[in-house]
Amino acid sequence: MSYPENVGIKAMEIYVPAQCLDQSLFEIHQGVSAGKYTIGLGLESMNYCTDREDVCSLALNAVSSLLSTYNIDPNSIGRLEVGTESPFDKAKSVKSVLTQLFEPAGNTSLEGIDTVNACYGGTNALFNAVNWVESRSWDGRDAIVVASDIAIYKETASRPTGGAGCVAMLIGPNAPLSLAPNVRGTYMTHAYDFYKPDFSVEYPIVNGHESIRCYISALDGCYKNLQERLQQKHDKSNTSTNGVKPDYETGRVMDLFDYMAFHTPNCKLVSKSYGRLLYNDCLMSTDEAAWQGIPEELLNLQHQESLTNKILEKTVVSLTKEAFQTRVEPSILAPSKCGNMYTASLYCSLLSLLSNIDAKDARGKLIGMFSYGSGIASTLFGIKVTGDISEIVQKVDLMNRLARRYIATPEEYEEACSLRSKAYGRKNYTPTGSVERMAPGTYYLESIDESYCRTYARK
């Protein structure tokens, strides 16, 4: 049986709100030490929404722009799936709202639905779409995957790690960014590090230190499973194919990926995570030279102890600094300006990477992608650059797009948070946030009627 080749991401689009918060101003506003957010977390600014936007309006903007920017026929789409952790309805999906973009063309045969598990939903939707194209159920049409979220916190200390936005991706065969089928490691388990059990509020319950520990532990688990799968593939074929480079013979994951993008709650966590991969490579190695530069007292740490050992953390970050600057730093340039976009975070990081490397030299490179969703669901997987990425880079124009946002004051941000808090769960509600700074053609929430039905307008 023949399968479609190079199934993956054919096109990408991103939508971010028209305004953002300057983190250096927020430091002053909150009375914390200078650099706590900008240096300590690596965050420059943060997207945020007023009561005029919700997860559906963000998605409407990203998908409508994807269709128009790439001149995609709505009837050429056979699957539409949304990853989100910001739904406001326990029954009606975000995807169902997006069907309004396809019905005018007569397309009501869209498979797929919402998928939810914290920040992992977008990745699960991507895997589902790729699997659909590669299956006997495929009808020959492309799929669209949407990752849309709004991150906002009740606790003052957590608010700098908020964000908002949506990434939409066209999925199909002969893609310039194809999923490497044999480069994947998954780790899933049970934890209460971050969750949203209270449907009366928009805010999560967060155990910050535990969530970071879970993130790093999940990366370890994905690393281990990836190594097991690659070893199985190597044992069967004794060759390196399907995106696995010949130099993987070294057994080092650090040698496997040319570039990497991570789910980015904050940018400092990304540098720590990249260093953690080096530590895992050392643990896997039988060569004592692999531990060069790492103090002897760190060689025999128990796993749980290693997750919180600051000396180890600083050591591996230092040892990987040069490689990080080349292979990973391009992926955090946009997230540092956007904040945490939850399900869209990893794919904002991917767009950032593509936008800040030389597109001409990217073909043939393997990008490592680490997706993490609290609770816990996580996967470390590979995307192979199998075509020209320049069209995506040029049409998204990411960094220039971010530069056009209005930089709000902390007071304006706090007012927006207050509006959202008052509006959440309301009926008979008319939003009062301004639409003045929204670009022409932007979808926004117009009203919520007495039956909680939402109406969206377009500027």
Predicted segments with their positions:
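Condensing-enzyme catalytic core mediating Claisen C-C bond formation in acyl metabolism
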Residues: M1-R52, S158-V244, I376, F381-K459
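Conserved beta-ketoacyl condensing-enzyme motif
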Residues: I9, R52-T123, V244-K245, T250-R276
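Acidic, glycine-rich active-site loops and adjacent beta-strand->loop/helix elements
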Residues: E13-Y15, V82-D89, V116-G122, V146-I152, ...
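Conserved catalytic cysteine-centered active-site region
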Residues: K36-G40, E44-S57, S86-D142, N280-S345
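Buried hydrophobic packing segments
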Residues: A59-L66, L98, A125-W132, C222-L226, ...
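Flexible, glycine-rich active-site loops centered on histidine and acidic residues
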Residues: E134-M169
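A conserved active-site cap/scaffold subdomain adjacent to cofactor or substrate pockets
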Residues: I212-T239, T250-G251, D255-F257, A261-S285, ...
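C-terminal catalytic subdomain
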Residues: Q302-K310, Q325-R405
